[in-house]
Every structure is written in structure tokens, then in C-alpha cells.
Amino acid sequence: MDKIEFTIRRAQANDYEAVSRIYSGRAVWGTLQLPIPSADMWRKRLAEPPEGAFSLLACVENEVIGHLGLFTLPNNPRRRHVGQIGMAVRDDWQGKGVGTALMQAAVDLADKWLNLRRLELEVYIDNGPAFRLYEKFGFTIEGTLVDYAFRDGHYVDTYMMARPRK
């Protein structure tokens, strides 16, 4: 099988429908995102991102197949060095390297351009594929957040993971 080449680019306001489709997929139910978001919510979020927010897209040709948000804390003097990550990959592209490409782009942006010393994220403890992806990029578990989120009718635990840059 040939290696798939992904293009990583910044999201634009007119990408809102494609991003909304990603977060409407069943795979998102395994993340901390609310399923079935409105396209209008994504239109507003991409048109007017908060200060310090970076929205990256993974594309094959011109098709958007993954999204990663990297959120910095520029107005918090004690946490300016921190970035928080959330991501999702379209259902039909799961397990094909999209998450790896997005994480590599986020780590490069954080390390080489934003001078962030710490990246953080939360992941459901039963989301093995995501957990292994984050470990591959140097993230480690810093704690378990008990009953952290409500999913599919139950409270579930998440891991708090971080990647401090040495």
C-alpha cells in the first residue's frame, strides 16, 4: 500500500461545514467533544477564533479529513508556556495516519514557533488508539480524572496527559 500524503493547513472560516462533518461522525463519541455539533457553531468558531487558538486541518487533495485545535493561554501570565490540544479524525480515515500527521504538526508548531514548554490533553481511559498516539509523541499520564465526563449515559474517567519539553 502506498503511503498517503496529508496536507496540514490552517483552517479558514469557509471550512466550517467540513469540520462540522468530522465532529458529527461516530468516532467523535469516543472523544470529549459533544457529538453532532451545529455547522453554525463551527462557522462562528472558525471565523472568530479566540486569541491564541490554532485550528489545523488534515487534507487529502482538497478533502478535509481531520481537525486539531491547539489552544494557548496568552492572557494567563503563569500558563503562557502551555498549549492544550483537542482533535478528531473523520470516521472513514481512522487508523490511517491522520492523527499522527496532525499531532506532528501541532508538536512542531508548539516547539519550533510558539516556544511552548508544555502540551496538555485529556483522553478517555478506554480510548486506546488515541492514548497510544499521544504516547508516541512523548505524552505521559499525569493523573486520572474520576467521573470527568458524561458519555453515553454514564460518567467516565479520563487521563490527564502532558508532554513537557525539556
Q: What does each model-identified segment do?
A:
Residues 57, 69, 84-88, 97, ...:
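Conserved beta-strand segments that form the floor/walls of ligand-binding pockets within enzyme
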Residues 2, 154-166:
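Terminal substrate-recognition subdomain of acyl/acetyltransferases
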Residues 111-122:
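Conserved GNAT acetyl-CoA-binding A-motif
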Residues 21-35:
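Helix-loop element at the rim of GNAT/NAT acetyltransferase active sites that forms part
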Residues 120-123, 135, 140-156:
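Conserved catalytic-core motifs of GNAT/GCN5-like acyltransferases
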Residues 95-109, 131-136:
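Conserved acetyl-CoA-binding loop-helix of GNAT-fold acetyltransferases
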Residues 13, 31-92, 103-105, 109, ...:
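Acetyl-CoA-dependent GNAT
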Residues 6-21:
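A short beta-loop-alpha structural element at the N-terminal edge
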